[in-house]
């Protein structure tokens, strides 16, 4: 019995002229009196392997009755294909049905809307589009780890359950074992001291604060894990559960942070072009016509840097009308970000040094006492895709900022401790993994780049 090989390898010519065994799912089947053609896919690549079955096959009648979606094992000889569009095909000597699929199988040979496919998220990975999405997602995730490993960064697993709200927005999912029907009370309020963690706990919104602690011991670290936001936003860009990449560097300022972000983003763009060519060609042809050219441009670009103040002036001089106002002290909206990167710069740009009152308490206050050492990377078609900053390493200044924005220092005593002994300038950034995959594939809805999306009123599967 031949050992199984993956269809990706068979299509590369492995086993050519010899007997091989492949296993996979039938994408399509065409039958006639003299021959049956099965398009077989096992998820290892975008392309299908054509299986040719002839009447001399003992199970030919059974093969002709196979339905789309059935799982089969095929043993046969891999040969050069006379047909155009494929190099090799498999002439079957034996076809065994492993799992039947009848006409009720939802993924029949027709075009399905993304909205419909979300309703069958347990089956959509078998479709062309989502097979490509999740191969790219897997490959890029591996590239993230490789990038940081090659540069000596320590991979840190930060906690998923936490009692701190890094962003201070209060959009945390709560974790409790208290009986919601009869919680213990103290002076009319829920007594969380009697909860499992003896405090009000939730799912993390970021691993940054804990990452900073490790950077003060290992210099360069990164986190890559799930994060959660209880934000009731039903938009194509928001999900309640998503993955974040968050590097942190000790002895680094804002410019070092921007340099790492540029190197990292260009690396990932180059990786997906080099490693996922077949899937990227599909996205370019069927999802986003200019995708490959746009990603190629970013991979080969030097990123511009623009002060927030200059960005505001450029926007004020714009000849287009914006939906949202443009004034110093207001945050940039997506329409502003896209105008800057697409019309003003014509490529990726870092906007730096934002007003401190629109940014988080942990960002380093600049000498003007009006701005903080923050940066956002803006890219064409998307706008902001990376956000980062130099962190405030001066204890008195950090305590003052926490007081300004109303962050309780008691819950972050450990974070303040990191500034008491051996504090260093340090910086880092965050990149939402799903938004990265959206950018690299041209997919326009975050629900379509994560296996089982979690959004308001939807946590099925």
Curated annotation (Swiss-Prot):
Which E.C. number(s) belong to this protein?
6.1.1.22
Alphabetically ordered keywords of this record? Aminoacyl-tRNA synthetase, ATP-binding, Cytoplasm, Ligase, Nucleotide-binding, Protein biosynthesis
Q: Name one GO biological process term.
A: asparaginyl-tRNA aminoacylation
User: Which reactions are catalysed by this chain?
Assistant: tRNA(Asn) + L-asparagine + ATP = L-asparaginyl-tRNA(Asn) + AMP + diphosphate + H(+)
Q: Where in the cell is it found?
A: Cytoplasm
Question: Which NCBIfam families does the UniProt entry name for this protein?
Answer: asnS (TIGR00457), PRK03932.1 (NF003037)
The entry's family comment says: Belongs to the class-II aminoacyl-tRNA synthetase family.
Name of the featured protein: Asparagine--tRNA ligase
**What species is this protein from?**
Geobacter metallireducens (strain ATCC 53774 / DSM 7210 / GS-15)
